[in-house]
Amino acid sequence: MSSAQLLTAQQLAARLSEPDLLVLDCRFALEDPSYGARVYQENHIPGAHFADLERDLSAPVRKGVTGRHPLPDPAELALKLQAWGLRQDSQVVLYDDGPGAFAARAWWLLHWLGKRDGVYLLDGGLAAWKAAGLALTNGESSLRPGDFQGQPDASLLIDAATLQAQLGQPGLALLDARAQPRFRGEVEPIDPVAGHIPGAQCAAFTDNLGSDGRFLPPEQLHQRFSALLRGRPVDELVAYCGSGVTACHNLFALSLAGFPLPRLYAGSWSEWITDPRRPVATGD
């Protein structure tokens, strides 16, 4: 069974009282890093704990070395997950405002640490919860420490040097989750260099969603990624984006479609461009 699973707002509402349920609010805004904590204090799904992208789901940036959202230290992340109440047998539901990129980053981190069963994204995110007229609260969520012990799986990652050595190999499928204008290098609102890694294809993460903001059916996602793979093996696929966040949305969608989980270049574009010797491409 795929490790990527979805819950509807109504399904989550029916399970909120279950004692083994852990809900994490992953809301964030790249242009306003304090946004997530602020809106969590205003209202959130009852019982949810707040997981901040920069404070909890990333390590500190090392200027000129890392990308904008380096992977967190696995031992530190495991301790935070324990503090929120994660146990080995917990059911976990992750949400953000709706597109799911920040929730997908949390999903990938849990998968990386070995928590692969019973982890769900709220399909449509908080927007779907609100649209269903379900309750929100601004109250404190109770803490009951968990016993989760995670071990990172290095096979899920590829580093910059290894990726650079593989550029140009016919089997490599390199998928960039950013939107077309950033991929082509026409605009770059965040990073100091525009463009993409040579040989990459644009696979905008938003194309995993329907017009209602929910994930496309697995069959449609399978067609999408099969077309992008062009017959290449999925174990040669590498996902990246601007900083290792929206790429996780593509990885979740790949898993939802029934593909085995390929590798993530976690440093992504913002790390790639820290070394001017690495090649850069623009256009299609």
From Swiss-Prot:
Sequence ranges assigned to domain Rhodanese in this UniProt record: 17-138, 168-281
Keyword Ubl conjugation: no
Gene Ontology annotations for the cellular component aspect, listed alphabetically: cytoplasm
Intracellular or extracellular location(s): Cytoplasm
Residues the record marks as active site: 241 (cysteine persulfide intermediate)
Enzyme class at the top of the EC tree: transferase
Location (main, coarse): cytoplasm
PROSITE patterns: RHODANESE_3
EC assignment: 2.8.1.2
Renumbered residue ranges of the record's region Substrate specificity: 241-247
Keywords (A to Z) from UniProt: Cytoplasm, Repeat, Transferase
Protein name: Probable 3-mercaptopyruvate sulfurtransferase
Gene: sseA
